[in-house]
Amino acid sequence: MQYKLTRIDPDAANDQYPIGERETVADPLVEGQVHKNIFMGKLEDVLNSTVNWGRKNSLWPYNFGLSCCYVEMTTAFTAPHDIARFGAEVIRASPRQADFMVIAGTCFIKMAPVIQRLYEQMLEPKWVISMGSCANSGGMYDIYSVVQGVDKFLPVDVYIPGCPPRPEAFLQGLMLLQESIGQERRPLSWVVGDQGVYRADMPAQKDLKREQRIQVTNLRSPDEV
């Protein structure tokens, strides 16, 4: 699996997205095994897996919304959907206490600096979910006042399509984020191991399901599914 080195030096002046460099590398744990004995290599692998397991099963979202997609996001917190099953029910009112933020709705030009400021106030590790067509690509608002995709100024980890997406789509996006977090390579502390942040290049769902969708010959209306 290929990894993308998203942060080389935590104190670097050019660490701000999208100025910071992004380098595609191999799995740092596998490459580092050559210079370690069997015990230390296995111990580091187990520690990374354990820490990633704790991170992905205890994701605290930052509570803010931009448009109608936020209504669908909050619906996922109700009893019929029960987002608590994934450990993401603890809504935080401060970005300094949150693990990930969901850009749910239309992002206007005037709002972009505010969102970026909130993202910078979040502590590492942190992740971003882009929810809905407007957040992904500007949606139907191809005008001067709307940002044509929040990845223009934020590093997005998961894109959720739809206008607006259903709560089930948000839950699927959350599970994809958990899967990605389980493959990440982050420093275990400020003195242990490589201090770079490596994020796995996860395959897009449309690529994984393309063959299955091509084989579909019997098309039905949504009411019959």
Curated annotation (Swiss-Prot):
Main location group: membrane
Cofactor(s) needed: [4Fe-4S] cluster
Record EC number: 7.1.1.-
Binding site for [4Fe-4S] cluster: C68, C69, C134, C163
Record-linked InterPro entries: NADH_UbQ_OxRdtase-like_20kDa (IPR006137), NADH_UQ_OxRdtase_20Kd_su (IPR006138)
SUPFAM superfamilies from the UniProt entry: HydA/Nqo6-like (SSF56770)
Membrane topology reported for the UniProt record: Peripheral membrane protein
GO molecular function, one term: quinone binding
GO CC terms of this entry: plasma membrane; respiratory chain complex I
Cofactor note: Binds 1 [4Fe-4S] cluster.
Pfam families: Oxidored_q6
Superkingdom per UniProt: Bacteria
Keywords: 4Fe-4S, Cell inner membrane, Cell membrane, Iron, Iron-sulfur, Membrane, Metal-binding, NAD, Quinone, Translocase, Transport, Ubiquinone
Reactions catalysed, as given in the entry: a quinone + NADH + 5 H(+)(in) = a quinol + NAD(+) + 4 H(+)(out)
An annotated GO BP: electron transport coupled proton transport
Protein's cellular compartments: Cell inner membrane
Keyword Cell membrane applies: yes
Assembly: NDH-1 is composed of 13 different subunits. Subunits NuoB, CD, E, F, and G constitute the peripheral sector of the complex.
Similarity annotation: Belongs to the complex I 20 kDa subunit family.
NCBIfam families: nuoB_fam, PRK06411.1
Protein function: NDH-1 shuttles electrons from NADH, via FMN and iron-sulfur (Fe-S) centers, to quinones in the respiratory chain. The immediate electron acceptor for the enzyme in this species is believed to be ubiquinone. Couples the redox reaction to proton translocation (for every two electrons transferred, four hydrogen ions are translocated across the cytoplasmic membrane), and thus conserves the redox energy in a proton gradient.
UniProt-recorded name of the protein: NADH-quinone oxidoreductase subunit B
Gene: nuoB
